[in-house]
Structures are given as C-alpha cells and as structure tokens.
C-alpha cells in the first residue's frame, strides 16, 4: 500500500487532534462527538474556495436534496434510527428538531436555517478548528508556500492550496466524510489509500415551487388516509371535517385518468440531460428519477409516488386516479417540493411537463430538479463495523461515501466513526448491537457482499424476532422496542467508556 500505518502508543495515535475531512452531515456530527469528549478537531471544508456542482452556500451541513429526514415514528426504520441518535446526543438530529417545518409524522427541516444553526454550533465549539481548504492530491508541478496560503503552478499562476490527504494520514487519525460529491482530487488519493477504485452512482433532487403559484381551487390540503372520506361518512360531514385541514402539512394535486395518461406520455418522451452509459447503470433505486420510473410502465407511478390511496378529491367526493404530493420546504411555508419527483429532465422540459399537472398550470419553479454524481467506496472489502479502514487503523470513513444512504444514516455513521476515533487512543472499540438500527447499518456496510449497494435504514437488516408476527405494524413495534432496550444497555456501557 502507498500509505503506511502510523505507529501508535497503546493502539492510539500520538497526535493531540483528530482531522475530519468534509463539513457535511457526517463530518459535523463527528466533530461534535469528538470535541465534547475533550479532543481537539481540525475540520477541513473546501467551501468557499471550491464548490461541488450541487452546493451553493458557505455553511456547513448544507442539504441539497429533499428537506425531509423521513418519519419520526418508531415503527418506521428511519424514525427508530433518529430516536437512537437522540439518545446518543446527536447534535444534528437535535438541530433538525429545532428547525422543523410541518410535515405530518415526518421530520422535515428549513434547509437554510438547519445549515446556519449547525454552522453556528460547530463554530462555537472550543475544541474545533474549521480549516477552509480543500484536501486532495496536489499536482507534482505545484509549489506550496510554507504558510499554506497559496500554490503556484508551472505558469506562475497562484491559487488556493490543496492539503494532502497522505500527509494528514501520516500525521494522525483522520475521518474522511466527504460525501457523495467527493472532489476528483481527493478521489484520486482515496484510491491510493484504499487500493480500490470504489463505485459511482447518481441520485436526483426534486423541483421546488412557490406556494402562491399553486391553484388551490384544484389542490387540497391533507395527510394520506386522514383526509380520505370514510366508507360510511356523509359527504357534508366529510367536507366539514377536511375543511380543518387547511395549511396542514401536504398539498395534494388530484388527477383523473385522462390527465394522468397525458402527463405520463409527455414525461416519458421529455428530453433529459444525457449521461454516460456507465452512469446510467449506476442510478440508485432509492432516488430514481421519475422519468426513468415512468418508463417501467404506465401504472408504475400510480403504485409509487403518485399513488392515490388514502385520498378523496373534494371536487368529486371520490378517490382520484393519481395524486401528486407537495411538501413544505421552508419554515415560512412559501416553498413546496414535489415529493418523489427527483429528475434529470432539462429545465425547460421540467417547466413544460410538470405544468401539465392539474393545479400547477401556472407554477413558479424557484429551483429545478438536478442530478448529482455520487461516489462511495467498496465498504465491505475496506471497512469494519466501526467504519475503520482495515488496512490502516488511523483512517475512518463516514457518511454516504461509505454506502449508507440518507441524511439520518450519514449522521449515524459520523457518530460511530467519531466514538471509535476517540477510542483509538485507548485501543478499544464501540460496536453497537446488531439489534439496534445504528448497529445493523454498520454491520451491513462491513458484511461481505459481491453486489454491494447503498442502504437505507430498514427493518429488513435487523435480526428477526424469535416469534413470527404477521401483523406488520405489531412486528415493527416489537423490533423497535427491542432496539431501544439494547440501546439503553449500550448507553450504560458508553457512560463507563467516556
């Protein structure tokens, strides 16, 4: 291997600080967990010197896809994971709770306020030094000044320096949390570090619409199932009941069969941004572009993100043929994103096709959907259950670059990597029980898998119950109760360790 393992005393690095590369969700959570335990952190973030194609502001923990952290219910896998993280004093979940916007039983945030608050909190930590420089592989022809203020290329042009990953690894413990948009320069050094070229995939972001441009004569407010007219419910009683749904969580856009089929036809024929063949093969199912999903069949969307189950159209008193949902995107309640409408359509086509949806004829799109490149390593071959690199114990990975998929999952991986980076000083490890969601995820990414793919939190990765339960809700409740019980025991052990 090009990088040699740093000699340690008692299994721990001799440096007095831990370096974290990447100021996203995983990196910020890791910084907090390490700093609160009295160890200094150097947090490297390349913004504002350099931005990825999807990022646009200088704050840490910037959210570029959906503003939803998914369900808060314990009977939902991601809801369970959030509850575990709350027990573990997750800074980012606490902040998300503080800046939450209405989203029914889900946790959705005002993305701007979330990033601002996380940035303020990290900046206020005495043990954290934020270094606004890119980490990666410097060119052989670059001359770096002694104070790391500039680099000069062969033509004499000065620019911001690139901090060497190799040097950081040689000096001490490093957590690489650079996310799905890891720079090309750093990707090259990661290849040298791991000896593995990793994998690439794409996910997509949905458009955001100005609320005032939505035709509320067609659209209606309400949550799935609670808005629906009961089987024996009188029409007038139902209308009176749903009248109280005003300004309640989701805006729903009903479609009849003719409207849906026309929309589907135009969507499947719309122009998209061209991808390379290898990119097309690597689209992650959990964030599949709606136009790709639509091409799988005319009814695919009606059984997916546009399913009408649980709704009644106030205009007809009947279930719609299909329903498009819009979710509040900011605390002011003036912006709404299109649920499940991650897309790679050209901007002009998005305006044309999505305006065919009843209620969006005059929609003002404040942000169009875009595709993002995502990079993740072959974690089952490279990492153990603590997100520690098997070939170099002073290197940890965290976040979506490890193959965990989702905001909450990324935060969880950052927390685990941080705890174990701290424990490296005492030659010990923190492994969460596989019965917990946080433990099951870390076990998944470390388990050999020839067809390794990104994974969200889900009950399928937990050990099954001894008793067989057919009722899905009851089964998930028991799995969640068991996880919280195991987490309680783990908390006692953590108190002894720290």
Model-derived features: where do they sit?
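N-terminal FAD cofactor-binding segment of flavoenzymes
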Residues: 32-94, 435-438, 442
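Predominantly flavin-linked oxidoreductase catalytic cores and closely associated redox partners
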Residues: 127-146, 161-326, 336-347, 351-352
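Intrinsic disorder/low-complexity segments
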Residues: 1-13, 140-170
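Glycine- and aromatic-enriched mobile tails/lids
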Residues: 137, 401, 420-498
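An active-site-proximal "capping" alpha-helix that borders the catalytic cofactor pocket
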Residues: 409-424
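A conserved beta-strand/loop capping segment in the N-terminal third of enzymes
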Residues: 56, 72-119, 123, 127
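Beta1/beta-strand and adjacent pyrophosphate-binding region of the FAD-binding site
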Residues: 15-26
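A glycine-rich dinucleotide-binding beta-alpha-beta segment and adjacent secondary-structure elements
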Residues: 337-404, 411-413, 429-446, 452-458, ...
């Amino acid at each position: 291997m090009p990088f040699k393992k740093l000699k340690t005393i008692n299994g721990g690095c001799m440096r007095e600080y831990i370096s974290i590369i990447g100021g996203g969700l995983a990196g910020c959570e890791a910084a907090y967990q390490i700093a609160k335990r009295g160890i200094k952190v150097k947090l490297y973030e390349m913004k504002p010197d350099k931005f990825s194609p999807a990022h646009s502001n200088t704050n840490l923990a910037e959210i570029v896809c959906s503003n939803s952290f998914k369900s808060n219910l314990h009977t939902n896998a991601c809801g369970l994971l959030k509850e575990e993280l709350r027990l573990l004093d997750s800074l980012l979940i606490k902040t998300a709770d503080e800046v939450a916007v209405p989203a029914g039983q889900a946790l959705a945030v005002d993305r701007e306020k979330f990033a601002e608050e996380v940035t303020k909190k990290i900046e206020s930590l005495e043990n954290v030094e934020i270094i606004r420089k890119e980490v990666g592989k410097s060119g052989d022809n670059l001359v770096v000044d002694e104070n790391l203020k500039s680099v000069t290329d062969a033509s004499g042009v000065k620019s911001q320096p690139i901090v060497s990953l190799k040097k950081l690894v040689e000096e001490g413990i490093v957590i690489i949390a650079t996310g799905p948009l890891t720079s090309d320069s750093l990707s090259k050094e990661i290849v040298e570090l791991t000896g593995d070229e990793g994998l690439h995939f794409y996910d997509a972001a949905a458009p955001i619409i100005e609320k005032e441009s939505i035709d509320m004569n067609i659209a209606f407010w309400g949550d799935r199932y609670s808005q629906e007219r009961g089987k024996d419910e009188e029409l007038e009683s139902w209308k009176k009941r749903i009248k109280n749904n005003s300004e309640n969580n989701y805006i729903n856009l009903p479609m009849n069969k003719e409207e849906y089929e026309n929309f589907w036809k135009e969507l499947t024929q719309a122009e998209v941004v061209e991808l390379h063949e290898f990119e097309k093969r690597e689209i992650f199912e959990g964030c599949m572009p709606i136009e790709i999903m639509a091409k799988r069949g005319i009814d695919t969307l009606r059984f997916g993100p546009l399913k009408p189950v649980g709704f009644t159209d106030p205009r007809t008193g009947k279930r719609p043929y299909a329903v498009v949902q819009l979710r509040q995107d900011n605390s002011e309640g003036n912006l709404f994103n299109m649920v499940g409408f991650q897309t790679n359509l050209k901007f002009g086509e998005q305006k044309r096709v999505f305006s065919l949806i009843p209620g969006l004829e005059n929609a003002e799109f404040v942000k169009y959907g875009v595709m993002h490149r995502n990079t993740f390593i072959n974690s089952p071959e490279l990492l153990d259950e603590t997100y520690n690199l098997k070939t170099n114990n002073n290197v940890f990975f965290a976040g979506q670059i490890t193959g965990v998929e989702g905001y909450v999952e990324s935060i969880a991986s950052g927390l685990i990597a941080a705890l174990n980076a701290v424990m490296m000083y005492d030659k010990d490890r923190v492994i969460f029980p596989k019965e917990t969601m946080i433990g099951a995820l870390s076990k998944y990414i470390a388990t050999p898998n020839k067809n390794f793919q990104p994974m969200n939190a889900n009950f399928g990765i937990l050990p099954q119950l001894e008793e067989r339960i057919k009722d899905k809700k009851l089964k998930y409740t028991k799995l969640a109760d068991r996880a919280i019980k195991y987490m309680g025991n783990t908390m006692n052990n953590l108190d002894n360790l720290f």
